[in-house]
Amino acid sequence: MPSRDKSDVRCAVVGLDTSGSVGNDLMELFKGGLTRIFEDVGFDKIYIVDFTDQVQRVTEYDRGEEFNMSDRFWGGTHFGSVTDWIEEEGLNPSCLIYMTDGYGRAPMQPDYPVAWCLAPDTDEYTLKTSGIDQYGEVILLKEVA
């Protein structure tokens, strides 16, 4: 049987912001969002890219595999480190989903769909100064009671 090229695999990349500005409560919201992605969306693979101002760790999951929550790292936020990693790996993801507090600058728009999953209290100022409002779908995560 011929092997499949990475670009043929239906995959999603989740850029998980693990910078110092992301608190424990927001990490819990991210965890809930990741759980929904794993349960509801039929990707062959999901890559979780933990990033701050650089990629800290990449974990690859196959469909149905349970995921582990990330460690916390410290530092600033550079969204472009995730898109750079995607390009370096030669991936053509079905989508890129950022889970972030929005404190950083959005990279140039890539050739694949992008969603920005943000804290429920994210304000317009953060969206505009980061450039997140320029492309992609903005999703405010719901607080879990």
Show where each model-derived region lies.
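Von Willebrand factor
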Residues: 47, 52-105, 118-128, 140-145
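Short, structured coil segments at secondary-structure junctions
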Residues: 110-112, 134
